[in-house]
Amino acid sequence: MSRVAKAPVVLLAGVEVKLNGQEITVKGPKGELALVAHNAVVLTQEENTITFGPREGFDKAWAQAGTVRALVNNMVVGVTEGFTKKLTLKGVGYRANVAGNTVNLTLGFSHPVAHELPTGVKAECPSQTEIVLTGTDKQVIGQVAADIRAYRSPEPYKGKGVRYADEVVRTKEAKKK
């Protein structure tokens, strides 16, 4: 039995939720997000809460209910506060800048890397070695951050590369002669 699914999602002021069968649409001050819930999950909406439960005849129904509850909670937080992911670049000559809907990266390759941002994701560069991604969809923000990090992930000897701001890179000792 899922402890996560037992807790209802409380809707804050200014958030509208529409349930249409298994489809959930959350609308708030920062935008609108939609999700199709798994068939094993029963969704019920009271005044300002949404509760989740299992449907009979499905294995792992409580697990699916917990997953859907977490996704809906992330949607509610996303349309009210939004999500932020911060990346830092470490290395000589590693730079980033934002031009419109593109993040331009200089990462030591023979060519600059241009990463197109999907809709709903905004990027800022407070400095040449920092990228701040913001948006309403937590999954999309995390995926964009992972894609940018994958261009040049931190190497284990000097730690050069693109890393998350809170990431700690374990460095190895160089080979001794």
Swiss-Prot record:
Pfam families: Ribosomal_L6 (PF00347)
Keyword rRNA-binding tagged: yes
GO biological process: cytoplasmic translation
The keyword rRNA-binding appears for this protein: yes
A molecular function GO annotation: rRNA binding
InterPro entries: Ribosomal_uL6-like (IPR000702), Ribosomal_uL6-like_a/b-dom_sf (IPR036789), Ribosomal_uL6_a/b-dom (IPR020040), Ribosomal_uL6_bac-type (IPR019906), Ribosomal_uL6_CS (IPR002358)
Entry keywords, A to Z: Ribonucleoprotein, Ribosomal protein, RNA-binding, rRNA-binding
SUPFAM superfamilies tied to this protein: Ribosomal protein L6
A GO cellular-component term linked to this record: cytosolic large ribosomal subunit
Subunit structure: Part of the 50S ribosomal subunit.
PANTHER family: 60S/50S RIBOSOMAL PROTEIN L6/L9, LARGE RIBOSOMAL SUBUNIT PROTEIN UL6M
Biological role stated in the UniProt entry: This protein binds to the 23S rRNA, and is important in its secondary structure. It is located near the subunit interface in the base of the L7/L12 stalk, and near the tRNA binding site of the peptidyltransferase center.
Family: Belongs to the universal ribosomal protein uL6 family.
NCBIfam families hit by this protein: L6_bact (TIGR03654)
Name of the protein described by the UniProt record: Large ribosomal subunit protein uL6
Annotated organism of origin: Photobacterium profundum (strain SS9)
Species lineage: Bacteria, Pseudomonadati, Pseudomonadota, Gammaproteobacteria, Vibrionales
